């Protein structure tokens, strides 16, 4: 059977599908922000199926012996949930205390999914909005672990800051009514809040990826045998002793 350097063809294809699935939700939200379609259309047709595909692949990965995909999926659940929690702490402080945000992005996503923009949020829209927000956070962490693998913690920080930059350059800014980098709302407080929120998110995902014993190598290393772009001091002893 065809095999890459340290990755079977089956796992390589499954990883590619999982990466695409993890990318669907943020791309769908960005596309909906252009006005070409709505989240109420994309959520059941694209976002939910992609989420179910990702879950199915992560669940079947251990049974198929896909160690790399198994590790990336499990670590993404840990790093993604923790990362979103600390990110939201910063965002809420920026919103409530310093008025650096126009409102709650998860609540906005929820009313867009349920088509309740004029009526306002309810329990279902909040549930779906926050669920999608956490799924996005998990998806971005999965992409990081599946592609970049073990790196020093600050690489995760750079990755998250890049996400923040793309976010503030995207059509979502027009949907929020704040303009590029929030210059029409709070030209200093908005980008500062977004960058700080993503900074702590990146630190968490980077720290988890560096410290966990099961973090995979970078994808190019496992595919083609390229030098592993990972921390040289692999903390096996510390992690395994806990």
Spell out what each predicted region is.
Residues 21-32, 84-89, 160-171:
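Aromatic-anchored segments of alpha-helical transmembrane domains
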Residues 26-38, 174-181:
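Juxtamembrane "helix-exit" motif on the non-cytosolic side of transmembrane helices
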Residues 48-61, 139-142, 195-211:
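Hydrophobic cores of alpha-helical transmembrane segments in multi-pass inner/ER membrane proteins
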Residues 72-95:
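N-terminal signal-anchor transmembrane alpha helix
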Residues 97, 170-195:
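Interfacial helix-loop-helix junctions of multi-pass membrane proteins
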Residues 97-122:
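Membrane-interface interhelical connector segments
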Residues 138, 148-166, 222:
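Internal alpha-helical transmembrane segments of multi-pass membrane proteins
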Residues 216-242:
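Short, highly charged, low-complexity non-transmembrane loops/tails of multi-pass membrane proteins
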